[in-house]
Amino acid sequence: MKRIFNIVLIFAVAAMTLASCDSNNRNQDYMQPKLAMQPDGIVRLSKIKVNPEYLDEYMKFAAEVGTVSLQTEPGVLTMYAVADKDDPCSITILETYADQEAYRRHIASEHFQKYKQGTIHMVDSLVLDDVTPLNPKNKIVNFIESE
């Protein structure tokens, strides 16, 4: 149980922080100004099953790609990853992209390709579920805190 807690804690601290903040905080020096969600925007739950022997290594890759994506890509609006409390190898990532083009730029980016190529052998399964927000007016403000 302590190992699970430590993994979740390390990942949460290293990867990203979901927080409410005013619009001024979204445009800090360490973050690109974010684009607005467009009608063709994407809200996705990525469900990943990681091979247990690679979990620690996978977490490092995931933390890096999440951080770099939020810091450098205006169209990446949210990258919030969580691990199942009872099965830390089951990872779910809430991803939001301003539009289809932002998603295409993201998956073509150097940091995403590094993550994808570096973790492909670590992932047992991947399900990408595009979802529809129940209340489109409810916005998530996701940012990386400066160190």
Which residue stretches match the model-derived regions?
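Glycine-rich beta-strand-turn "strand-cap" elements at beta-sheet edges
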Residues: 17, 22-43, 80-87, 116-147
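An amphipathic, aromatic/His-enriched active-site/gating alpha helix that lines ligand/cofactor pockets
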Residues: 25-27, 68-78, 96-132
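Bacterial N-terminal signal peptides
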Residues: 8-17
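Bacterial N-terminal signal peptides that target proteins for export
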Residues: 1-8
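Short, surface-exposed ligand-recognition loops at beta-strand->loop->(often short) alpha-helix junctions
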Residues: 49-58
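Short, well-ordered beta-strand segments in beta-rich or mixed alpha/beta enzyme
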Residues: 41-49, 78-107
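General detector of folded, globular domains
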Residues: 43, 63-69
